[in-house]
Amino acid sequence: MVVPADTPGLRFVRSQVLSAPHPLGEIAFESCRVPAANRLGEEGKGFALGLKTLDRLRATVGAAACGMAARALAEALAHARTRRQFGKPLGEFQLVQEKLARMATHLTAARLLVYRAAHAADEGAERVTLESAMAKLHATETAQRIVDDAVQVLGGKGVLASSVVDRLYRSVRALRIYEGTSEVQHLVIAGLLLKEDGR
């Protein structure tokens, strides 16, 4: 149902303060009357519509994760190029190079999974459950590791409250929770793989 904000009985309860890149709040429905014309889809088909919507939303969460990971990688690269330790740029140390290479490789793989899910949806696939679950799972888990590695590359600067990577570190964690936790994505993926037709 689409419920207009001025509907009698619809009440804003409170804002939720959380580590996420967007606002969240709690609302209450107290004896709200909503006309049938505001119904989305057919009666009795809401759950199926909700699941189909999750297919699309999970891919967008994966895309958001890729964006955060890309920014974290950019910050780590900039720091590795300009920060000097023991008389040379931080980026010349092999352990830092290994982190940067791994971050970039995993980000590219995550992007490809997100693109695959988006492409399938754009091509009109009825369901993209498997593609979007894989994209969300891999991209959010990868983004968490990439942001963590970026904090490590930046060292003390990475944990300053004013640091971009510190803000990303606090925000990226929520992506592994909403639109289905990582654990739920594992169940969705395995369940589909175990079906004979994979759908």
Residue locations for each model-derived region?
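Structured core elements
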Residues: 1-2, 11, 28, 60, ...
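C-terminal helix-coil-helix/basic helical segment that borders enzyme active sites and/or dimer interfaces
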Residues: 77, 81-88, 104-138, 151-159
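FAD-binding core of flavoproteins
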Residues: 1-74, 78, 88, 182-199
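Alpha-helix capping/hinge segments and adjacent helical runs
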Residues: 126, 130-199
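Extended, low-aromatic, Leu/Ala- and acidic/polar-enriched alpha-helical coiled-coil segments
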Residues: 63, 94-104, 133-136, 141
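Conserved catalytic-core motifs characterized by acidic clusters
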Residues: 13, 37-54, 79-93, 117, ...
